[in-house]
Amino acid sequence: MKYHFSRGLRDDDKQHLLAALDCFDIVAYFETSNGKKKLFGFGVKEQSQSPKELKGDIVFGGYAFDDQVIANSKLMNGFWFIPSIFVAINDGKIRFESDEISDFDQWLMQFLFSKQKAVTIRRTFEEKDWQSRTRNLINKLNNDAILEKVVFGRQQQYALSAKIKMSYLIQKMASQDNTYHVILKRHDEIFISATPERLVKVTGGNLKTAAVAGTIRRGKTVYEDKEFGEYLLNSVKNKREHQYVVNNIFQKLQGMTTNLNVPKQPILLKNKQMQHLYTPVTADVNTAYSIVDIVQRLHPTPALGGVPQIQALEYIQTHEQSPRGLFAAPIGYYTADNSGEFVVGIRSMYINQMVNTATLFAGAGIVSDSDATQEFQETSLKFKPMRQLLKGYTYDD
């Protein structure tokens, strides 16, 4: 028997729910970019490495970026699950579904928020040759008749003196505006993303996606911020990089959708540290296709892989130092009525609580006229959202 319950949202509900995230081995958290909708999945009824094998009222999960395998990980190579307990917060109301728990308030009140213990953080890994490898890539792009763009990833790793609570990380993410806040946890493994980029949303057959490519930092003053934004809107390199993504989305959605609408010019999408070129795309989904079909079709966009796709992915697999796992991959949820939403796992971090390490991810779109030093600075900027989550701890670099 499935239990359903709903009521008005109380002031302390979210605190109890955040505390609950630290008490289950398998959980998911999905918060929309406007902060109005928050979805929680606790425990597991069914799980799989492929979403095609799961049919439930709601399924959470994520694909791996590609077919490279991360050794000893049961999360980063792709993971999907139907939660045993589902909670949604939306429009000032809280909704609960479970096959196991009949009294929601009694269940919720057992989870008490506790303070994060002091943690010392020490950087243990940095790709010191990244700029050199990026210069090699730029040289190849200038001498290769086929390869046009490669999104080149970069990683940093930190040793943690103790476990970091998921509840604490989500609280810290609240300062990251205009971004989705997404977490997947499987036992001692946690993937967390504060991503500005939606891959696709489907509701009642209506599809929304967007091209997000081309980045510059926020200004320190209103005038400087506007100046940077104008520079980005008029940057030949960034506009070309952005158009790769727009064209790719248009081509991939043809045949799967009708009423496909793609604006001719991008606008600016601004979040705490960065501003991006942004083109929203809408369409109606053909009934023959599920949201999972569309996710598989769209991934990876040129904002995550490159152009042409096959050659760019081959370069990434050969020249990036470590597999990406869930980094830059689709993460989200879908429902039994073929609705759902997926984001791409950028501005992200992987925490392994078994060995207390945190791996941060960033990437930059490299084209023939890129500058390796500038791209290094851009990736350093893209580490900031996750570095911000670790801010306040003691660093021992």
Positions of PLM-derived features:
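Short Lys/Arg-enriched alpha/beta "domain-start" segment
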Residues: M1-K55, Q156-M166
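Short, solvent-exposed loop/turn elements at beta->coil junctions and helix N-caps
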Residues: G8, R186-E189, P330-T335
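A short glycine-rich, hydrophobically flanked beta-strand micro-motif that places a catalytic Asp/Glu
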Residues: G61, V150, V182-K185, R324-G332
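A residue-level signal for conserved active-site and pocket-lining positions in enzyme catalytic cores
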Residues: G61, V87, A145, V200, ...
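Contiguous alpha-helical scaffold segments within structured protein domains
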Residues: K2-L9, G92, S102, Q106-F125, ...
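An anion-binding catalytic pocket shared by soluble metabolic enzymes
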Residues: D22, T32-K45, K74, A159-R240, ...
